[in-house]
């Protein structure tokens, strides 16, 4: 057995460029690799002008909305982390999305039409939508806030809360409230268990910004561009499909006589799991790229609408190949007792494995904060691991 201390290298790529996660308890903002004290003002200079790889349209969007773009960049970072979690047992495990010190979309695999390319695009689009909508609900962005609610709905909620307050004081329902007009919904009674209220996450704004920021790269008549746009749409659709209802109790002495509820973005782990399931049933498109951008054969739109699509057969990803975005599997930790994809037999592609004693320092107990830093503890781990030759 070999003994080799292998400290974990510092994060690179998007992690290093945007939000280098802290390996100590010290607080720091790192936007695009800039070390800034506290919570700096998010200006075009701190967000846009130091980030390479933006298209002309993206740069313009960033200059107009630097705070929203900062949230979008955090969404990309979270999406890469989730991608790595979902594919942690695969030969291609999303680590290539971190390299290059630029946006993930400059990774070689995102210029191809593999299954893994489709999954990555959907994850990144979902991450941007999710992060922007969440920042809206927290009141962090100038150009958006809570999801829209009609004045009638607000009036119903106000009447309900006033009625509950009056009842808690032993009084009758206040007569000063305006009575509903013809055709209006009746005033809510105290027996009603919940009403829509609170701050809905503005998913429409998050979806639109994700579309404007990511789909702007695409040429509309190119088959690869159409594949990317389609998979971007699927990623955003999964976020919408998994919206959650969150509620807050109202009542005396901690009771829950009445609840106000709002629609909130799902946990991003649930989004990642749903997209991982779609990866397993992704649809192969046999296409003749005649610059028409049409999928051949023409499948029913309903069948395609919620599924990932790809048009290139994936390589085995055993060896390093920068042209395909494959880092290879040499040096990857494997499970020698597993017969699944994470087993040494599969992951090491028949090359065998070594047993090493590794000591590394890694980030742990990380918490994402808006915007744009990650606060982590520092953990030292020593263990025997099986590593692919």
From Swiss-Prot:
Effect of residue 211 to Q: In STHAG8; reduced activation of Wnt signaling; reduced endothelial differentiation
Entry-listed glycosylation sites: 93, 335
A Gene Ontology biological process term: negative regulation of fat cell differentiation
Residues where Phosphothreonine is found: 46
Disease connection: Split-hand/foot malformation 6: A limb malformation involving the central rays of the autopod and presenting with syndactyly, median clefts of the hands and feet, and aplasia and/or hypoplasia of the phalanges, metacarpals, and metatarsals. Some patients have been found to have intellectual disability, ectodermal and craniofacial findings, and orofacial clefting. Tooth agenesis, selective, 8: A form of selective tooth agenesis, a common anomaly characterized by the congenital absence of one or more teeth. Selective tooth agenesis without associated systemic disorders has sometimes been divided into 2 types: oligodontia, defined as agenesis of 6 or more permanent teeth, and hypodontia, defined as agenesis of less than 6 teeth. The number in both cases does not include absence of third molars (wisdom teeth). STHAG8 inheritance is autosomal dominant.
Family as reported in the entry's similarity comment: Belongs to the Wnt family.
Protein name as annotated: Protein Wnt-10b
Species of provenance: Homo sapiens
Taxonomic lineage: Eukaryota, Metazoa, Chordata, Craniata, Vertebrata
Gene transcribed to yield this protein: WNT10B
